[in-house]
Amino acid sequence: MERPAILPSGQILSNIEVHSHRALFDIFKRFRSDDNNLYGAEFDALLGTYCSTLSLVRFLELGLSVACVCTKFPELSYVAEGTIQFEVQQPMIARDGPHPADQPVHNYMIKRLDRRSLNAAFSIAVEALGLISGENLDGTHISSAMRLRAIQQLARNVQAVLDSFERGTADQMLRVLMEKAPPLSLLAPFTLYEGRLADRVACAALVSELKRRVRDDTFFLTKHERNKDAVLDRLSDLVNCTAPSVAVARMTHADTQGRPVDGVLVTTAGVRQRLLHHVLTLADTHADVPVTYGEMVIANTNLVTALVMGKAVSNMDDVARYLLGGEPAPDDGKPVGSARVRADLVVVGDRLVFLEALEKRVYQATQVPYPLVGNLDVTFVMPLGVFKPAADRYARHAGSFAPTPGLPDPRTHPPRAVHFFNKDGVPCHVTFEHAMGTLCHPSFLDVDATLAALRQEPAEVQCAFGAYVADARPDALVGLMQRFLEEWPGMMPVRPRWAAPAAADQLLAPGNADLRLELHPAFDFFVAPEVDVPGPFAVPQVMGQVRAMPRIINGNIPLALCPVDFRDARGFELSVDRHRLAPATVAAVRGAFRDANYPMVFYIIEAVIHGSERTFCALARLVAQCIQSYWRNTHNAAFVNNFYMVMYINTYLGNGELPEDCAAVYKDLLEHVHALRRLIGEFTLPGDPLGNQPQEELNHALADATLLPPLIWDCDPILYRDGLAERLPELRVNGAHFQHILWVEMAQVNFRNVGGGLVHNRPVRNENQPLHPHHDAEWSVLSKIYYYAVVPAFSRGNCCTMGVRYDRVYQLVQTMVVPETDEEVGTDDPRHPLHPRNLVPNSLNVLFHNACVAVDADAMLILQETVTNMAERTTPLLASVAPDAGMATVATRDMRTHDGSLHHGLLMMAYQPNDATLLEGAFFYPAPVNALFACADHLGAMRDVGAEVRAAAQHVPCVPHFLGANYYATVRQPVAQHAAQSRADENTLSYALMAGYFKMSPVAFTHQLRRQLHPGFALTVVRQDRFATENVLFAEKASESYFMGQMQVARTESGGGLHLQLTQPRANVDLGVGFTAAYAAAALRAPVTDMGNLPQNLFATRGAPPMLDADADDYLRRTVNAGNRLAPVPVFGQMLPQVPAGLARGQQSVCEFIATPVSVDLAYFRRACNPRGRAAGEVHGEEGLMFDHSHADPAHPHRATANPWASQRHSYADRLYNGQYNMSGPAYSPCFKFFTPAEAVAKSRGLARLIADTGAAASPTSNGEYQFKRPVGAGELVEDPCALFQEAYPPLCASDSALLRTPLGAEEHFAQYLIRDESPLKGCFQHASA
């Protein structure tokens, strides 16, 4: 640094006068005037210059030179090919016994020069050249000073260039060593297994050890900084896993006692300080280092290739002497130049090594990154919403986390969040709401490509039943049922897969043929006859075709993937703080549904009333007497199988006509129905209607007006349904189109009617008005809730919808015997209708008597009034409808649902096999409309039902194909299986069923996810983070021969001056017969990304076919993008993405979501795993390993996959994240590398090649025969091991934040779980040290 003279303020002008040209100062003397303009001249004076001084870095004084044999080779630029020959003698062991005697074996290895160069440049301006040459000197002091300054600047430039070559030598040598240094986690397992890779078993064991070492060795200093022995173990592994050099260098490094240094550890300044302070002890603080380079001179015209055995030789005589006689070259008495410098010498194990950090000494302020500071990409995987099996839902001490007094423990509920820590130790969480950008995107419904791919392979219809819908013929329902039962066994040559109660292990077992069609959480894929539905009554014998149907509701997910325990737990959660049926209500209703002696006459009365409010009011006295008698006899509630009856009873008989405790049952029952109805609103956000339907109808199936109740008594639901023209509703009535009939009296009744007319029932008032509904639309919604949620909760599948023979019912009513009487008499009076003398065989009186129902004459006489409003028949209805606005896309618009319903049918509870009234279908016959109402026992009411049909009905619901099919129904077999298999009480089950009827569509998810309703499937959260690493490199002494040629200067003249380009050729050759260097990621420098919870938003990263309804598409975009933190991808040329308003923790890492069965094995996520659910990174694996599920998962041989919605080809997640379909890319998707076959196969082959190359301890390079360099792909072990192994690591996370606060405690607490950190960062963060 040059300092200017310190000038007193009063002498500034005098000094300028002395040091400047006199003419510059004369201006102040020459002009003396009053004109101020004469004093306007100005000039600048350079009073001082401050500059930084570069200190010359001598490479040979650095610890890095320990690993080098540095030789000056002026003729290097003329060498066409330099070769070094190694002679390696294989050691022998003399042994006794019959072994053949070993003979000496000599191996010869040739290595060629690896050519490199160093470049630097500087320029001299024209003005500086003129000053230096003297041409621009004018004899003044200023020009002399400027000339001196130009010379000084040139000297500084030359010094800077020389310094740059010294620094470049260090940088180049460090990079050379890095190129040939494999990671410790790669070399250590090979040392352990001694290169024995003869078969796949040994190779697999090696890969397993590789994974363990990557996890344990990465950041060992950060993890074990307080554990000195653990760090020393890793350092010992590092310095002992390399092979020694074959060179015996003349110039070497030693400590002050003369002990040679065995190698060098090069690392960062931070790691060096931590090692010296906590781990290593200084063996010496100074070292003797060489300060001169060896010389290699090729004299005369000898162009032979020099063979240098790692020695720094003076001339060719040394070479010849060594080759001919093998004698060491004499020193000729000339001392080798050395100097004692400041150094850190430490002992690691039994080796003395030079500890060096070049970060500040060489690289500071050079704008060149330090090679030992790298980046590590780690992909994390976290399970969200997984529900554990019952055996794992326990707590070691139930009082560890006490719930609010008086409330259920929320930790028994299915988890809806996953909690973890970000890089600053701040607790974060991801909930289902974060997944809106994925699940609420139209790509959720895009299955066209999947269908097209599945249809490429021939499909055979194994079982048409459940996959085919027929159009009913114009015939009586009883006749249609008889014909169906005759043909039913032929429709099922094999048991349909949808009816097989497969457990999760069975479904996911290797080789399961049914697994290939389980591709999407929201779609059923099945093989059906290639005909349009509804089709002919007889199933056509045509080719099969793979079809898809939306599952509509989450309850239709197979039980193997969404088990009963989970559904019940979700139902219990919803029941908390909501209405629950009183125990007396539950007992009374349950008793009625299970009563095998339920009075058959009650069904007759239901049929006579057939939902008519007018008729009910007329028969109110009779109904009240029936209820009272049944209540006194059994303490059960009558008519609870009929929603209309329950509503009318509560309205007209609940104010004193019934016993108080009996009336309370019906009131409580309806309060529960209304509570279930309110549940829909509680999980629906306010919003404008879409497609002429309110948001509640788009969110919940039972609120959807297009779904008819299973039993209807009037045309109200049909009228409300027909108002939704956007859904293209169709209604087939006995194979004909719907027509309404206001009401039918005795004179117009036609019991043989097979047309499309339906009786609407006579209204209570306003009889002369045209057709209008009897009740509002809410009545139909409550009716569906009652039949689809309340009834199954009590019946558990032990009920059946029945057709009614109204001709026989009305005949039976006319057979009643009612004696004339003017007063009420007892049953012992002959004037009472139930007196024995009035019990005429086959009369209605007998039915009342047998049921012990006490009714009087006045009540029975009113039955005669029913002829003014009669029912003709039970009519089958087949209602089909297109998807709603929240589910309609180009792919789904033709996927119409077909649901069956009965008009003027009834629901029969427990079957009474010994009641002759039911035999041979005298009054009632089975007509199941849904699997929920298809009890096999009720087939006994149909004549001529064979044993084969009865046996089949025990396993497959006997729903006729003209009333729908499983795959086309809104409510399917899994819901019925849930109701039948559930062990929950009726309150919980009713809420559980209601939760199962929430729809699965992008629009529906906007409500459910925002309201924190578990959607019925779990999610796998995938996030990739980047971490800055501090590496440590170990190199053996004299392990690299480094040649430096003659400096070459290229001169280029230009108008601005002279440009000088300096180039020095360099070359290097490895001096080992193995890997002589190794490195490891010793410490975590800093997280680069925030390790946060920024969710992926597919609206910003990819396109998809939009929703057909423009308003729905706009609603999704507005709802999902509200508060979005992810900027869109710049795909519009120069248009830049929106920049977030602010960032708190730097670069944000993106979380992506993979739909996962809620029953997935939680243990799968406790270790490193593939987010797809199936391993794909095995050494011998190809693309077939990823998708061929006929073979077991290599990592989990007992199953083919943990997630069929992600691991199979063309599955939902595969179509979403597989880059093969050009819909995803590596820049914006952490899942890309796991789902793209090209990436997975490349990494698999790279891993195989890495193992082979490392095992052979040789890897070919581009310009030499054999160099022991780092094998291709080895760098990924410390840069992106997740991509190489095709596995992601679980971080410390928990479904309950309380478990994070006690990470050393139990991992299980009822339904909540804790996942311990199994990533390479385990132990690096204090807040995540579990």
From Swiss-Prot:
GO MF annotation, one: structural molecule activity
SUPFAM superfamilies: Major capsid protein VP5
Keyword Transport: no
GO cellular component, one term: T=16 icosahedral viral capsid
Compartments it resides in: Virion; Host nucleus
Disulfide bonds: none
Record InterPro entries: Herpes_MCP, Herpes_MCP_upper_sf
Principal cellular location given in the protein's record: virion
Key words, A-Z: Capsid protein, Host nucleus, T=16 icosahedral capsid protein, Virion
Any one Pfam family match given in the protein's UniProt record, by short name: Herpes_MCP
Keyword Protease tagged: no
Subunit comment: Homomultimer. Makes the hexons and eleven out of twelve pentons. Interacts with triplex proteins 1/TRX1 and 2/TRX2; adjacent capsomers are linked together in groups of three by triplexes, heterotrimeric complexes composed of one molecule of TRX1 and two molecules of TRX2. Interacts with scaffold protein; this interaction allows efficient MCP transport to the host nucleus. Interacts with capsid vertex component 2/CVC2. Interacts with the small capsomere-interacting protein/SCP.
Function: Self-assembles to form an icosahedral capsid with a T=16 symmetry, about 200 nm in diameter, and consisting of 150 hexons and 12 pentons (total of 162 capsomers). Hexons form the edges and faces of the capsid and are each composed of six MCP molecules. In contrast, one penton is found at each of the 12 vertices. Eleven of the pentons are MCP pentamers, while the last vertex is occupied by the portal complex.
Family according to the record: Belongs to the herpesviridae major capsid protein family.
The name this protein goes by in its record: Major capsid protein
Organism field: Suid herpesvirus 1 (strain Indiana S)
